[in-house]
Amino acid sequence: LMRFHKFLFLLLLLSSFIQAQNAPSVEKNQFKINVLLPGFVYEYGINNKNTLYSELSAGFGYSSSGFGENWSFYPYIQEQFRHYYNLEKRTAKGKVTSRNSGNFLAMAAYYNFKSITTNDSYSSSNSSVVIAPVWGFQRTYKHKFNLDLNVGAGYGFSKNDSEFVPVLNFTLGWVIGK
């Protein structure tokens, strides 16, 4: 009887260890190329549910007025500490969690460089910083096609101004590598 109890205990211990090994987890390293707003992303898995997300991208703008036409180029860097909170739930429902497909909460920081314009009659926007808590989701589909959306409310400040600002980041692209 004592051997049976030891065997049962060992079996339960081993099965819980095996389950822990199969728990859904974020990728250790993930690279992406964005095409909607051209850019590059690297996401580093800190542990099973948390990542450090780094993005270098650019936005574009066009305006026309009595001063003439103007194209603007807005490079920016974004950093996020992401917590993926629904990986187990997605796995239980048979949904994909690979390549960090899940919902997340994050603390985001953006650095927007001074814009570059094609018409000297238009002034460039100053560099600025935005800090914001955001909610979002990321999905990677067939052929590694990736969609990432996050929204929040933040505080932005520049050399001349500071204010509360809405935050919206939407990217389409591909996961590259494995």
Regions found by a protein language model. Give the residues of each.
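Bacterial Sec-dependent N-terminal signal peptides
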Residues: 1-26, 172, 176-178
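Short glycine/proline- and aromatic-enriched beta-strand/turn motifs that initiate or cap beta-hairpins
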Residues: 20-76, 107, 113-119, 175-177
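Short loop/turn motifs that connect adjacent beta-strands in outer-membrane beta-barrel proteins
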Residues: 22-27, 49, 86-102, 141-145, ...
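Residues that define the transmembrane beta-barrel architecture of outer-membrane proteins
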Residues: 27-36, 71-77, 103, 125-131, ...
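Membrane-embedded beta-strands of outer-membrane beta-barrel proteins
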Residues: 40, 79, 133-135, 151, ...
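Residue-level signature of outer-membrane beta-barrel architecture
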Residues: 44, 83-85, 137-139, 155-157, ...
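Outer-membrane beta-barrel translocator domains and adjoining extracellular loop/strand segments
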Residues: 65-69, 94, 117-122, 159-165
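Outer-membrane beta-barrel "beta-signal"
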Residues: 75-92, 165-178
